[in-house]
């Protein structure tokens, strides 16, 4: 597909190109030393959950009891943590840590892998936790981060953390740069935070109130940030998980903020009977209509910059070989598969949505062969992404470190920037309040690694970043127009007297 054809198709699709500035600011000096940008997107860990003990980072070591203490739903301190409802370990783990065994923990953060406690190492899969748009805002509690337990479905598990020093990526962090002030782009889960990486935008469901999704419109209080609590919800977090009038995927003004399925295969929603086999059934209430916002990929293509999204186990899933627990391909982790510009049959889809291979083999082959495009995004398959409930930390972390090792040996390494981060916190508590910005975020703090021959080696970067900081660097490096969501985030930060988000360059020495 030519740049002109792509531009025309985007306009005809009703995109927001008119809201994107027509010109871009020239790249700052030194940015052109980076020829290859690689973004690796893991899953569902807060900074404190894995890196709260990292030397020099803003972690857990010096926190007072008051900074950790959690409040009940009535605003009073909990006398203890509730048990991990349903058990601390995921279904099928043997021996399990049961709900009863997890009861009566003190009101504090605790080590999941403590040998004198639960002794559940990073190789053990723990249960999943709520990580949803409205609940996260309720947990943050206006920046106090003191109601994570109150508005969780997993009881006290949200306060758990690990000794991250046993992880291979800990050594990578010590060698390169660990960012300890990096926040997920949006409140909530993977679905929305993958859109933040692709377009700094929030998907929409037009006319949701008259569509199959009408039952998923959330019941929200007048403040717009709090779900309406059901009459039969337990008054205390010690009595069980909260219940809501309607905790759906759609906001009252029809934005999709919790998990919806792609309109194109591969999707968790199969094609309609007798319908196009390349399309998910649009009548299913969890199928999101095709989206038309401008993405970072669109802007790169219009500038003639090569790029690709590599999805682990993409082709295997298209071939009907997805399975649980391996590879456990996650359909809603593929943001470009929601956009009309990359619909089945388009040249753009063929060029830019690539198979990362089983266990990342195809992505690693491109690394080893020196054939990565200028900008690459890599999404590991489900069992290697560290998501609670179906993946363990150790396997995913080892995979990340293995990929980094290949990148260090790549023919393209000498002018490469690698960013390894997580999509969101996965429901786990973190003690740092997110900066106040716009309606969508940013959400909680997550680990991020800046890896490059130009990295300020062996340092912790305290610069304020969020997921859009990755897009900011790409935008600056390739002289792209600024996505409207980034413009809006910048304005919101200024309006709330918050510092701007960095573009990752503070972690680099581009004067070499």
Residue ranges of each PLM-predicted region?
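N-terminal pro-sequences and low-complexity stem/linker regions of secreted or lumenal proteins
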Residues: 24-512
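Gram-negative bacterial Sec-dependent N-terminal signal peptides
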Residues: 2-24
């Amino acid at each position: 597909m030519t740049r002109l054809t792509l531009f025309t198709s985007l306009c005809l699709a009703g995109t927001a190109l008119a809201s994107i500035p027509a010109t871009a600011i020239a790249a700052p000096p030194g940015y052109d030393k980076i020829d290859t940008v690689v973004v690796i997107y893991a899953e569902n860990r807060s900074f404190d959950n894995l890196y709260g003990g990292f030397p020099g980072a803003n972690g857990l070591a010096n926190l007072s009891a008051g900074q950790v203490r959690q409040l009940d739903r009535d605003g009073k301190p909990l006398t203890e943590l509730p048990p991990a409802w349903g058990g601390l370990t995921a279904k099928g783990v043997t021996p399990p840590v049961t709900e009863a065994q997890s009861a009566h923990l003190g009101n504090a953060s605790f080590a999941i892998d403590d040998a004198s406690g639960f002794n559940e190492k990073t190789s053990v899969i723990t249960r999943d936790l709520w990580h949803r748009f409205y609940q996260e805002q309720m947990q943050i509690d206006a920046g106090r981060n003191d109601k994570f337990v109150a508005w969780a479905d997993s009881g006290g598990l949200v306060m758990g953390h690990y000794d991250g020093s046993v992880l291979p990526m800990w050594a990578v962090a010590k060698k390169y740069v660990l960012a300890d002030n990096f926040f997920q782009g949006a409140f909530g889960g993977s679905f929305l935070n993958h859109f933040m990486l692709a377009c700094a935008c929030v998907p929409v469901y037009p006319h949701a109130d008259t569509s199959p999704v009408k039952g998923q419109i959330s019941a929200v209080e007048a403040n717009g940030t709090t779900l309406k609590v059901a009459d039969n919800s337990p008054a205390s977090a010690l009595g069980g998980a909260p219940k809501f009038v309607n905790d759906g995927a759609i906001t009252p003004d029809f934005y999709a903020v919790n998990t919806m399925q792609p309109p194109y295969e591969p999707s968790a929603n199969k094609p309609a009977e007798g319908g196009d086999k390349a399309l998910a059934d649009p009548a299913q209430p969890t199928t999101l209509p095709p989206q038309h916002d401008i993405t970072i990929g669109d802007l790169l293509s219009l500038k003639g910059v090569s790029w690709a999204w590599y999805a682990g186990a993409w082709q295997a899933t298209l071939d009907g070989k997805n399975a649980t627990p391996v590879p456990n391909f996650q359909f809603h982790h593929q943001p470009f598969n929601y956009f009309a510009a990359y619909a089945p049959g388009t040249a753009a889809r063929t060029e830019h949505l690539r198979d990362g291979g089983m266990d990342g083999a195809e992505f690693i082959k491109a690394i080893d062969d020196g054939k990565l495009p200028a900008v690459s995004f890599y999404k590991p398959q489900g069992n290697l992404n560290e998501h609670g409930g179906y993946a363990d930390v150790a396997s995913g972390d080892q995979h990340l470190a293995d990929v980094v090792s290949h990148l260090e040996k790549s023919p393209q390494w000498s002018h490469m920037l690698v960013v390894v981060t997580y999509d969101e916190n996965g429901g786990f508590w973190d003690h740092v309040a997110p900066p106040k910005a716009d309606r969508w975020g940013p959400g909680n703090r997550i680990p991020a690694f800046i890896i490059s021959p130009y990295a300020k080696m062996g340092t912790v970067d305290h610069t304020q970043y969020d997921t859009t900081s990755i897009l900011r660097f790409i935008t600056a490096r390739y002289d792209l127009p600024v996505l409207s969501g980034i413009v809006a985030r910048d304005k919101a930060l200024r309006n709330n007297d918050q510092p701007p988000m960095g573009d990752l360059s503070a972690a680099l020495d581009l004067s070499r």
